[in-house]
Amino acid sequence: MSVRHALLFVGLICLSISAVGQQPRGQRPPEAQAATPPANQPPKPANMETRKDVAEAPPVVTQHQIQVGGKTLRYTATAGLMPIRNTDGDIEANIFFMAYTLDGQAARDRRPLTFSFNGGPGSASVWLHLGAIGPKRVKMQPEGLMPAPPYQLVDNEFTWLDQTDLVFIDPVGTGYSRAAKTELNKKFLGVREDIQSVGEFIRLYLGRYERWSSPLFLVGESYGTTRAAGLSGYLVEHGIAFNGIMLISSVLNFETLEFTPGNDLPYILYLPTYATTAWYHKKLSADLQDLQKLRSEVEQWASTGYAEALAKGDRLTADERNAVIDRLSRYTGLSKTYIDLANLRIDEPHFSKELLRDRKLVSGRLDSRFTGTDSSPLGETTGFDPSMSAIRPPYTAMFNQYVRTELGYKSDQEYYILGGGFRFQDWNWGPAVTGFPDTAEALRDAFDKNPFMKLFVGSGFFDLACPYFATQYTLNHMGLTAQQHQSVSLGYYGAGHMMYIRDESLGQLKKDISAFMSGALK
């Protein structure tokens, strides 16, 4: 696992999700009598017994309203810490969450409820929260570029709150979520540990806020899709079944993404996104300007001629090799000499550096439409991602202002937005003994045990972190039945990993999710 991938993708872990589903759950907090909620407001969490004089801080509850489509949405926001206890009742960690419930709902326990988180591992939920789903969003330029400071937070006319209540979860080591003691980090920092603690949070929330009978949805982005897949299998084993799972920029089978010796699959699956990126930056010939035809042509050749050539390896004849070099150069915009030196195999870090080298620019990884400069024009790869650099400052500034001034949650602790909460090497990836991790197995398991579950998968055409063709490959190799495939919906967008930073893609994502949720509730 390269450092470049460290904050968005899991390393080579080997995790049997079915085994994860059978790990013992944490001790439930002592039972308490639930209070009756005031009219049109969610119930307050029941008072929970504490142990060893460790008191829980009550969540902060505030009232708000926004304008959406000419209508006023009035809602209640709750921000606070959910304690995670051990079998003795001691608090071992606190998970920070922000929840939004629409006011004026007669049967709240029947209103849909969606749990949301981002990825990393090490990323807080701020990206989906203030980018796509929540009632407020960070205002970017129309194509997703960073605006000039000071940044703005505006009403999100594309919020999902009109259809579902929302809960944003920051796993331990992200946001304000912390282990109670440093030595307890190991109980939360790991693939299995993370699934268990987030699963325990969901169980606790359903109980404390009396939402056990609500239709349930789960949405994750990037490594959050890995977590969501694991949770779908883990929680169904504990009696919690979801109506729908939404995967944004997904990675389930890591064999499709990891450029390691002997694994040619990523080179094949990245190629359509390389071509799309080269098209965007005007690196392709005049006869390749129809983007839809270009993608279809490259997908077809990548799956056939290119895959066959890589399978032949050193057995390729000189003529065969030259033909592949010609085709790769045509589709990627890279020189034939460079492709030859790369042995027909271009990984993402080298592609992002080489494509625009003649312009002294590098292209983005999370969103390959973005460009930037770096300090080493002669370097083989770039040291930063210009798309992340454009997104991070506005989201960091606006969240820290928003959580204090609008949600009323004040803390001197640093809110870990992306990294900083733990060392990457402290994450427990599990025993690497069975090859690449493939959490699609957990999702398949959930489909088998919950035949009513629906799946939505959204991908950006300019995402070089989780390329759309790799996602297609994974979905087509899950072993789903024809009927199960009918429960899968796909969405594609003309942007990158965080497709919602682009106004047009944000609107389309909202339409797609709205239709998906309506179908999942039938």
Regions found by a protein language model. Name each.
Residues 453, 467-477:
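Short alpha-helix in the alpha/beta-hydrolase fold that links the catalytic acid
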Residues 210-222:
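Alpha/beta-hydrolase fold nucleophile elbow
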Residues 28-49, 89-187, 476:
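N-terminal cap/lid subdomain of alpha/beta-hydrolase-fold enzymes
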Residues 496-505:
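Catalytic histidine-centered segment of alpha/beta-hydrolase-like enzymes
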Residues 161-164, 171, 188-206:
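Alpha/beta-hydrolase active-site loop
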Residues 220-233:
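Glycine-rich nucleophile elbow surrounding the catalytic serine of serine-hydrolase chemistry
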